[in-house]
Amino acid sequence: MERMRTTYFVGGRLVDGTGEKAVENAVLAVREGKILYAGAAEGAPEPAVEDLAVDVSGLTLLPGLFNCHAHLDLNLPYKDYKVDEFGPAYRAMVSYRRAAEALVNGVTTVRCVGMDGGADYAVKKAVEKGMLMGPRVLAAGPIIIATGGHGNNDPGSMECSGAAEFRRAARNELKKGADLIKIGLSGGLASPHEGIADKQMMDDEIRAVVEVAHGAGKKVAAHLGGDGPIRDAVRLGVDSVEHAYFMDKETAAMMAEAGTYLVPTLCVSSANEYLMAHGSPAYQLEKLALAQKAHKDSIRNGVRAGVTICCGTDLLPSDPFEGTTATIREVELFTEVGLSPLEAIRAATRNSAELCGVLAETGTLEAGKAADVIAVSGKPDERIGDLRNLRMVMKGGSLVRAELPGLKADFNPAGMDGELSGGTFITW
């Protein structure tokens, strides 16, 4: 049998995502979609005559980024009660486009935490079956909320009252193939008739969802704005806290002790200009003003307590945001709340892979794992802003973005020849 060709990336630096320091003069070898070797040049296997060597001098190789809090069908500004401007079929098309944008901008895994009409399931299946090229997708289906709770104006939200209804809703999503369950446990920024820290689910309702999900080996993500509801979520076994706009030191310590993950979505509380550009209503901007400083202080509490931080934006992964994409800006913001650049990279790779349950497959550059790789000019482990200098994206060994001599991308979605990150600013 003919031996498959191996591609060797040589001469650059390598940050493997584990938190270890960069390897200088590194080699990354990729064969049949998997990493064959990742490490120092001295220990690398010898290339065969038929193999390809790619010089990445001046670049740093890293794992593909994760976005653990995405709504690929996001449409702004929010409209009146349960207005569906897409419809389920077109919603899936729009969601795929957003997934493709995420991929070419370095996000190789997307965790969807509340989408309508089965769009996340559709994109996930199409990518897994090889029908379409896209990032790895984890799907939660719609957010499951209390009657009248956070997100009730969303056409696909699933409103429940009582433990039995919440239990049934969680089981229905598992039946569809959900990778996780998302609940709306507290109020938030997007809805007008609620406080950010209002608790909206009763303990028995939370417990019912957690029991169903954990019984099926799945995690529960919870929208959480305030300190009291966060404590209840941690006590009742919720796996990841999403947002945490208001969280004190004691609650952060409780999270750390329980091993609860934190997906801060710092982009949201920095989104004044973004929301104004989208014509968001005054009540959202007023709530945002309340949350801004408190949010960063809350996440600092989490960092100091040793809570595991993961990367997610709430905005589209590829949304243009403060001179880059939302995902990369989120990683930059981590360094403003106490993480070092190396720790911020770990949060967006290894930590996030662990939360998503795919660490055995991806999230770090290690032999045997999927070749989900990005290359950037500079040293992002020292200057996190160098993540903006994206030169290559590889997903499962396929080049989806290639701005290096001698390389050609295998992926060129329609309309992406120029602008690679239109995000919600494109009116679909």
Model-based region annotation:
Residues 72-91, 100-103, 133, 141, ...:
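Active-site gating loops and adjacent loop-to-helix segments of metal-dependent hydrolytic enzymes
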Residues 91-99, 161-173, 225-229:
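Short, acidic/polar
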Residues 94-120, 134-143, 178-192, 218-219, ...:
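Divalent metal-dependent hydrolysis catalytic cores, especially in the metallo-beta-lactamase
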Residues 1-26, 31-32, 36, 41, ...:
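Active-site microenvironment of metallo-dependent hydrolases
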Residues 59-129, 147-150, 204, 236:
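Metal-associated gating/positioning segment near the N- to mid-region
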Residues 42-62, 86-89:
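Active-site metal-binding motif and surrounding structural segment of the metallo-beta-lactamase
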Residues 187-297, 310, 315-318, 338-340, ...:
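Active-site core of metal-dependent hydrolases
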Residues 215, 219, 293-379:
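His/Asp/Glu-enriched, well-ordered alpha-helical/loop segment
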